């Protein structure tokens, strides 16, 4: 799960901005937190980005999605995915620095996230699509210090957690070393990290193309849950199906014992938005739990 994401010098953001899921030590709503033991910080299950129109909310999501896409796209292109499905691909915004003084202002991003009993820190700095710095550290939860997995500074790469002997360090300056390791080697700690990045879902509904993507499953439990959520929100569908012959997605309603079908694209905009958003929200809540 994501603990913290920070970045600066990206599009409309010049100064460091932190999207933090670490909970403040307040008694209120403590039962709603993702509780850690005595050696771990409590985490918020949900974070909210709010502000005026044009205030940069979408740019924060793009900053997050761009780094994830930078890491996972090469892995996808070379068919080296650890998972069977990649949610976050080809984020449209480029990793573009804020054009105040582009020669001196590289784009910087940093992630803290947990996988199992470990917390990872991944950091990357980019200028003109070239990676200047990249590092990955791992800390076992409860430990006071983190161990270096690898660190890349320009063309120099050092290792810590595993022996780098036999690993090629001649990496294209436009490719992340994390991606390079996944594509060319089988290293358990790297596999664990890339699995987390592959599972990330960044949905920015300011992008109209996002409204055309449906996340569905053939699992009966998923279908039943999705229909129940739609019903709870006042949308009286009884089912859905895909017509493979006409390549059409249909929502079903039952009226007076008879079932009727309506093409998804003929539904109201609100129904379409909910049907696209709810599966992603449900998956996020399940994973976060």
Language model features with spans:
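Pre-Walker A-like glycine/lysine-rich segment at the N-terminus of P-loop NTPase domains
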Residues: 2-69
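Short polybasic amphipathic segments
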Residues: 5, 109-111, 131-139, 247-255
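Glycine-centered tight beta-turn/hairpin loop motif at sheet-sheet or coil-to-beta transitions
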Residues: 12-14, 115-119, 256-257
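Phosphate-binding glycine-rich loops of NTP-binding sites
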Residues: 42-91, 274-280
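Conserved ABC ATPase signature
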Residues: 46-50, 246-289
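Extended, loop-rich substrate-binding clefts of extracytoplasmic carbohydrate-active enzymes
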Residues: 79-109
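Conserved amphipathic alpha-helical "coupling/scaffold" segments
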Residues: 102-119, 124
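Electropositive, glycine-dotted interaction segments
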Residues: 117-242
């Amino acid at each position: 799960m994501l603990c913290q994401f920070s970045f600066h010098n990206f599009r409309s953001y010049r100064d460091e901005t932190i999207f933090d899921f670490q909970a403040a030590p307040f008694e209120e709503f403590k039962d709603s937190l993702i509780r850690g033991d005595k050696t771990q910080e409590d985490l918020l299950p949900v974070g909210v980005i709010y502000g005026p129109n044009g205030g940069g909310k979408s740019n924060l999501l793009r900053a997050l999605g761009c780094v994830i896409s930078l890491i996972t796209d090469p892995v996808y292109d070379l068919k080296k995915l650890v998972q069977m499905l990649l949610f976050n691909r080809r984020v449209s915004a480029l990793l573009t620095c804020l054009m105040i003084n582009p020669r001196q202002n590289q784009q910087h991003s940093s992630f803290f996230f947990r996988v199992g009993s470990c917390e990872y820190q991944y950091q990357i700095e980019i200028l003109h699509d070239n990676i200047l710095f990249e590092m990955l550290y791992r800390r076992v939860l409860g430990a006071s210090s983190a161990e270096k997995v690898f660190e890349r500074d320009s063309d120099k790469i050092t290792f810590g957690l595993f022996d780098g002997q036999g690993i090629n360090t001649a990496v294209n300056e436009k490719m992340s070393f994390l991606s390079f390791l996944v594509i060319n080697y089988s290293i358990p700690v790297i596999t664990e990290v890339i699995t987390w990045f592959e599972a990330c879902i960044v949905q920015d509904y300011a992008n109209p193309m996002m409204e055309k993507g449906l996340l569905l499953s053939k699992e009966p439990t998923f279908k039943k849950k999705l229909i129940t959520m739609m019903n709870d929100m006042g949308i009286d569908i009884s089912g859905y199906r895909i017509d493979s012959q006409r390549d059409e997605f249909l929502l079903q309603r039952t009226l007076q014992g008879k079932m009727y079908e309506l093409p998804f694209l003929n539904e109201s905009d609100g129904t379409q938005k909910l049907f696209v958003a709810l599966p992603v929200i449900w998956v996020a809540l399940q994973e976060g739990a």
